[in-house]
């Protein structure tokens, strides 16, 4: 068996043992990457989040800006904590796909590429990706959640 085929079979095994979950009704709040302002902003935002209630809070860092991914229901409350001159934009109707890989495989190279490729081939606009083993999150438009989920079900489990 060729090396390529072995890797494909191994990836298939990893995908079959993975779980896919989704989250909808999210909002992105993008702010300027001014570390001094963020130093004050982040603790006050965190104080409004309740992990026990399942509140979503992710920080996505970039070179020029920082994005907060939050539940839409928290949007107004969080915006009050952000100085107007620090706010770049908000994006509503965001969805998230969370892929939970089996930890027994470690951090295998090439595990994410086929997923991104398959979504791209199927015309899915990926806003952001984040995470690392054992979890990989894909941020997309909420309207694409169902289509993405179906694509990943086919890729992972061969379901039609």
Protein language model regions, located:
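A conserved regulatory-domain signal marking ACT and ACT-like small-molecule sensing domains
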Residues: 1-160
């Amino acid at each position: 068996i060729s090396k390529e085929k072995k890797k494909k079979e191994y990836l298939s095994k990893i995908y079959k043992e993975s779980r896919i979950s989704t989250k909808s009704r999210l909002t992105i709040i993008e702010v300027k990457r001014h570390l001094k302002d963020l130093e004050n902003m982040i603790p006050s935002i965190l104080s409004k989040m309740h992990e026990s209630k399942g509140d979503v809070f992710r920080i996505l860092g970039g070179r020029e800006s920082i994005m907060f991914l939050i539940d839409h229901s928290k949007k107004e409350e969080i915006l009050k904590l952000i100085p107007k001159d620090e706010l770049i934009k908000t994006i509503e109707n965001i969805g998230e796909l969370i892929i939970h890989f089996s930890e027994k495989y470690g951090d295998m190279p090439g595990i994410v590429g086929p997923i991104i490729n398959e979504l791209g081939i199927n015309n899915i606009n990926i806003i952001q990706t984040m995470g690392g083993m054992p979890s990989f999150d894909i941020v997309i438009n909420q309207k694409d959640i169902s289509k993405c989920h179906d694509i990943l079900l086919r890729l992972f489990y061969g379901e039609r």
